[in-house]
Amino acid sequence: ISKTLKPGGKFAFNTSFFEGGQLPESLLFYRKWMFKSARILRKEHGLSTQRTAKVESRKHLTAEQYRELVERHNFTVVKQEIDTVNVPIDGWLDISTFEDFIVGTLPGVPLDAASDSLQKGCHQAFEELNLTYVPRNWLDMVAVRA
């Protein structure tokens, strides 16, 4: 990106996959969701995850590490914010179809079975906890090419 943008060009991104993306009050949802998904995976698909090593996509950087990474590539950060967003079930169901998320969450499992299990587990967790949304922090960053 730094080689593509001319000096003064803007680079903007956001992510909820950073250290700090999960709020303490949402941890129960994540635990229930993953527990239920793993159970569904075993019962309905006869599969289990292969937890040999943490998948690279699951290694979250801190907001400061993202900043350092951007600055190391000849950018000046002009805006860095963390916004809390209330994510409804549709957001979690959508992410349950995203390959990088699936591979990071249920490593070694065929994508279709993993996605199915994640979606069913999400429905069960939302229902059991009587949720309409789960709060999630998003890191927003805007940087200018030096």
Residue ranges of model-derived segments:
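A structural signal for well-ordered alpha-helical scaffolds and beta->alpha junctions
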Residues: 59-63, 115, 119, 136
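Active-site capping/gating segments
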Residues: 36-58
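Ligand-binding pocket scaffold of soluble enzyme catalytic domains
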Residues: 13, 130, 136
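Short alpha-helix
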Residues: 57-74
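C-terminal helical/coil "lid" or tail adjacent to the Rossmann-like core of SAM-dependent
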Residues: 79-132
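A short glycine-rich, Lys/Arg-flanked "PGG" loop and its adjoining helix->strand segment in the class I
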Residues: 1-10
